[in-house]
Design a protein with these regions (language model features):
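Short acidic, glycine/proline-rich loop/turn micro-motifs
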Residues: 44-48, 120, 169-170
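Contiguous beta-strand/loop segments that form the cofactor/metal-binding neighborhood of enzyme cores
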Residues: 56, 60-147, 180-193, 228-230
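Active-site loop of classical SDR/Rossmann-like NAD(P)-dependent oxidoreductases
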Residues: 171-183
Length: 230
């Protein structure tokens, strides 16, 4: 049994967003965004790879889009280097658009520069997401890059007929509580003999989306997911 630790799926805010999509609260999704302004801690082993953000950070956001909405038809990605990251790399800052057959567009900005927050300027760091549906709106803040990193994520949502936004809260946070979910899905699969919630076959589609993003950035064109995942 092979289960994959795509742990952003188990962030409490991301799970709540999925619930609103599944139960129809916000209706058909029209536009979704993830906006990351964060400064990752790159590991020494990454310095020899020539890449950083798409395979380390963006993969979580692409997988979250897949978790929320399923597989897109294509992706367009644009990247540039991060001025703060001194070792050779191509994808320091990334932006990409996932195009769905329904017309839905899922857009992400993964900004690892965030302005000179480490060089003397005040910091404005955070990860925000937003889903606009035909019947409602949901938006959230991911606590991972806050100080402390155990800050709980948040969600705020409202639908047609509501007089105000709803803002449920919880004490858990992505780190470390989301990892309970990824470990539990493996244990459930071992107990039942069923495919894990995030199995290897499913994760290949996320990996294909990342590879399609690299190809898109290299060739300056939209890349069909079917070009990579056959």
């Amino acid at each position: 049994v092979l289960a994959v630790n795509q742990n952003m799926r188990y962030d409490q805010s991301v799970r709540a967003g999925k619930t609103l999509l599944t139960n129809g609260t916000i209706g058909e999704p029209i536009l979704a965004t993830i906006d990351m302004r964060g400064i990752p801690h790159w590991m020494p082993w990454q310095e020899r790879q020539g890449w950083v953000t798409l395979r380390i950070m963006s993969i979580h956001h692409m997988d979250t889009f897949r978790y929320w909405f399923g597989d897109p038809e294509r992706i367009y990605c644009s990247v540039r280097t991060d001025p703060r990251t001194q070792f050779p790399h191509t994808d320091g800052i990334a932006s990409y658009i996932l195009e769905y057959a329904s017309g839905l567009r899922a857009i992400a900005v993964d900004d690892t520069w965030t302005g000179p927050a480490r060089e003397g300027a005040p910091a404005d760091i955070g990860i925000e997401w937003r889903i606009e549906g035909l019947d409602g709106l949901a938006k959230g803040n991911i606590g991972w890059c806050q100080d402390p990193y155990t800050t709980p994520s948040t969600i705020t949502y409202a639908a047609k007929g509501d007089s105000e936004f709803h803002s449920p809260t919880w004490p858990e946070s992505w780190f470390p509580d989301a990892f309970i979910g990824t470990m539990a899905q493996l244990l459930i699969a071992l107990e039942t003999g069923e495919e894990p919630a995030i199995g290897a076959r499913d994760n290949l589609k996320t990996m294909a989306l990342v590879e399609a993003a690299y190809l898109s950035a290299k060739e300056h064109r939209a890349v069909e997911l079917s070009e990579i995942h056959k």
